[in-house]
Amino acid sequence: HADGVFTSDFSRLLGQLSAKKYLESLIXXXXXXXXXXXXXXXXXHSDAVFTDNYTRLRKQMAVKKYLNSILNGKR
């Protein structure tokens, strides 16, 4: 019984870690795309681009913090 409980808990933990890695890779890929977009549009509307990218980054950071809190069992 103890082995089954350990295996179940360990499998759940591995699933959470996999989900966390996947979401972090999505966030990192979106941040890299935002940085590339900022470099391409450096001349035109730089203030608006900065504000938009900053807002996206803040939202991504908030999502990452929320997901980390859920995956780590805190709310």
Swiss-Prot record:
Signal peptide: none annotated. Keywords: Amidation, Cleavage on pair of basic residues, Hormone, Secreted. One of its GO terms (cellular component) is extracellular region. Pfam families: Hormone_2 (PF00123). Its main location: secreted. Transmembrane segments: none annotated. GO terms for biological process: adenylate cyclase-activating G protein-coupled receptor signaling pathway; mRNA stabilization; positive regulation of protein catabolic process; prolactin secretion; regulation of protein localization. It comes from the Eukaryota. Belongs to the glucagon family. This is VIP peptides. It comes from Sus scrofa (Pig). The gene is VIP.
